[in-house]
């Protein structure tokens, strides 16, 4: 890792190309938060692997809880409620639950949903695509509990949680599907939460609602195929 023009730069060469990641000055060295792995996927040959998520690499629960707390502390001081959190399957289901758990200490009027790739016998809220994934289709179902369903219907703040945002396209696809479903008509603001955000200005430029982003680090990436 090196520093160039005030940015931190991390480079890695894979068998099919080279990726360069840069971020603004941060409390976290880039290599403390993630590494880059190669994968057999023609849509995207590389994968950001988190070192603090606790999914692909074993992580102390204390480290994970500290991450949830730090992300929650970056939320706006006031949230218009109710609040709906959505964690992305499969990687961010635990991350979303952890951030939700921390935020609801101060904003109890909220509910947590997750996407899934598995059809279940329940009422479908919406479906959307994670286009770069090996398994593109995501489903979100309504809660069974009547009180939670009412929270969803009345929600004014929508929180979307994923482990990382590479282009921001998945968040935008989900938001479009939710708006098309008519289920969250009262939402006024979106909060996009990630451990690492490489999407640049894409979310701000394309989000149809006021947006606040939360991440431990943000920056950009460049892929050079070989």
List the model feature ranges, each with a label.
Residues 1-226:
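PRPP-associated nucleotide enzymes
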């Amino acid at each position: 890792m090196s520093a160039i023009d005030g940015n931190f730069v991390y480079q890695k060469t894979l068998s099919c190309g080279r990726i360069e990641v840069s971020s603004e000055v941060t409390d976290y060295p880039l290599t403390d938060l993630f590494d880059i792995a190669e994968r057999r996927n023609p849509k995207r040959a590389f994968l950001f692997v988190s070192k603090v998520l606790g999914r692909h690499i074993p992580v102390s629960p204390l480290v994970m809880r500290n991450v949830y707390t730090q992300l929650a502390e970056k939320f706006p001081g006031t949230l218009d409620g109710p609040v709906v959190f959505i964690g992305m399957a499969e990687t961010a289901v635990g991350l979303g639950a952890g951030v939700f758990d921390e935020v609801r200490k101060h904003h109890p009027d909220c509910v947590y949903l997750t996407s899934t790739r598995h059809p279940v016998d329940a009422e479908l809220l919406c479906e959307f695509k994670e286009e770069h994934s090996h398994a593109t289709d995501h489903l979100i179902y309504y809660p069974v509990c009547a009180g939670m369903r009412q929270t969803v219907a009345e929600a004014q703040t929508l929180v979307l949680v994923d482990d990382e945002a590479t282009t921001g396209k998945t968040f935008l696809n989900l938001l479009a599907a939710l708006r098309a479903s008519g289920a969250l008509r009262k939402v006024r603001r979106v909060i996009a939460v990630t451990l690492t955000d490489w999407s640049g200005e894409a979310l701000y430029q394309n989000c149809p609602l006021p947006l606040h982003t939360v991440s431990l680090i943000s920056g950009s990436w460049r892929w050079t195929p070989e």
